[in-house]
Amino acid sequence: MHNLIIGETCLLSYQLRRLNITEGKNELFDNMLATIDGVYDLIDDNFNNILNEEYLEFINYMYYPDHNISHPKWINKKYSLDKDNIFSWPVFSFFHYDAFNQDQKDSIIRKTSRFKSKLEDKENVNLFYYYREGKNYNLSKIFEKCNNFKKFISEKYDKNFNIILITKDAGNKNLLYKKIDNIHYFNFTSPYSWVGIDDNWDGHCDNDLFDIFKTEYEKIICNID
């Protein structure tokens, strides 16, 4: 069983590695920003345009508009998608990469090839997606997108894919698990923000909740294909 991250931020990369749910070499989306809309279209295109220079642009992206904070980053315009206006960061960003540095470009190519091979082989796959909170947050729409994505990718590669959706609300610490339709859904509640400008970008203030998440995840993983 492969465990792969498909977005939206590198928070999951930190936490899933800390919990030993993912291990080994970094995968394609571990250090990128992407929406499920962009990932869907990228896979539908068989990854062919991920580094197509026609779509690459170096921009000063406004990551925290409320604080007037921006960062210069490479993006792929073709996959910077928000088809229903529900994402806080509608961008496909090579966040920790310089897409025109040859060594880093080669790294992206290797990661793309490795990621694609795991989709294509015979092992089933767990796909982890963190839906980042924001003013356009729409839980029903993200469930619809996740279900559509699961159907699409399972049919494309003719094997089973499980979607593990993670969201975060403000409040007293709690972790809720539900299976809704075909999606394994974990909702974290905590007084600590995961989207602020402080250093809690990796959710480390809620490591205790992620430890509980691992226990619950291991229970359900025994019962899914």
Predicted regions and their residues:
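Extracellular glycan-modifying ectodomains
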Residues: M1-D225
